[in-house]
From Swiss-Prot:
Keywords: Amino-acid biosynthesis, Arginine biosynthesis, ATP-binding, Cytoplasm, Kinase, Nucleotide-binding, Transferase. GO terms for molecular function: acetylglutamate kinase activity; ATP binding. It is found in: Cytoplasm. It comes from Aromatoleum aromaticum (strain DSM 19018 / LMG 30748 / EbN1). This is Acetylglutamate kinase.
């Protein structure tokens, strides 16, 4: 995977050149919204966590409006194991009974969210932690998931997994105007106050649509989307995605990621990228340079 040179390897002249190279991107994206789905190794490796927080703060300071949506799969699995439960997934979605929902809300809305907020704030940002239950800004209903290769209407029960029905953007707009950085745990609320676990990629994609984001960036543990031979696919169209799903190249956790990315691209998000979160400062590379680090999803 591509690596950046260590800071000590870069001369002062080169540092100045790098800053100057970023200027066109800073001008282009000034006051634009970038929705970032934060997950994978970038959330567990201490150095990568620090790089991510610094990237987000820098993006805010140069005039962009970053909005962070995070996952927390490994942390959820750790706590489930402590209480004697085993995680189960169907078509990339976590099966969520009542006990699992308690664990998910505790981990995502508490432990993980507050750690991200704290890291960003340590580097000079003004991060605010939220779940979709705050101001009921992410409304959801129970997801009825269609079984694979089954007749229409033949659904599988995945418990308290939610499908987004409405996102109210006013809370995020209010925070942006105050120079705050929203950090969102993917938990929604039902009409009767039910709590729903929503896939973080789905939340990020829908939020990018509603906010009319300039970019949606999804961090992964791979260089991007790979073909069967393990080669990076730098650009994908809907037709190519259908072929990759049909032949089994795309499966599991990559399915909701690809689906959300494609929906966002089709619904007005100008640029959608699935990038390698294991690369230091991957956000700056993707947004403020020509050095892409992943796969771009095209709407056509």
């Amino acid at each position: 995977m591509p690596q950046l040179p260590a800071p000590t390897d870069v001369t002062p002249a080169r540092k100045a050149e790098i800053l100057a190279e970023a200027l066109p991107y800073i001008k282009r994206f000034f006051d634009k919204t970038v929705v970032i789905k934060y997950g994978g190794n970038a959330m567990t490796d201490p150095h990568l966590k620090d790089c991510f927080a610094r990237d987000v703060v820098l993006l805010k300071l140069v005039g962009l409006n970053p909005v962070v949506v995070h996952g927390g799969g490994p942390q959820i699995e750790t706590l489930l194991a402590r209480v004697g439960k085993k995680g189960e997934f169907i078509q990339g979605m976590r099966v969520t009974d009542a006990e699992t929902m308690e664990v998910v809300e505790m981990v995502l809305g508490g432990q993980v969210n507050k750690e991200i907020v704290s890291l960003i704030n340590q580097h000079g940002g003004k991060a605010v932690g939220l779940t979709g239950k705050d101001a009921s800004f992410i409304r959801a209903k129970k997801l009825l998931m269609q079984k694979e290769d089954a007749a229409p209407g033949d659904v599988v029960d995945v418990g308290q997994v939610g499908e987004i029905t409405k996102i109210d953007p006013s809370l995020i707009a209010f925070l942006d105007q105050g120079d705050f950085i929203p950090v969102i745990a993917p938990i929604g609320v039902g009409e009767a106050g039910e709590t729903y676990n929503i896939n973080a990629d789905v939340v990020a994609g829908k939020l990018a649509e509603i906010l009319k984001a300039e970019k949606l960036v999804l961090l992964t543990n791979t260089p991007g989307v790979l073909d069967k031979a393990g080669k990076l696919l730098t650009g994908l169209t809907p037709h190519q995605i259908d072929d990759l799903v049909a032949d089994g190249t795309l499966s599991g956790g990559m399915l909701p990621k690809i689906s959300s990315a494609l929906d966002a691209a089709r619904n007005g998000v100008k640029s959608v990228h699935i990038i390698d979160g294991r690369v230091e400062h991957c956000l700056l590379l993707e947004i403020l340079t020509d050095h892409g680090v992943g796969t771009m999803i095209k709407s056509k």
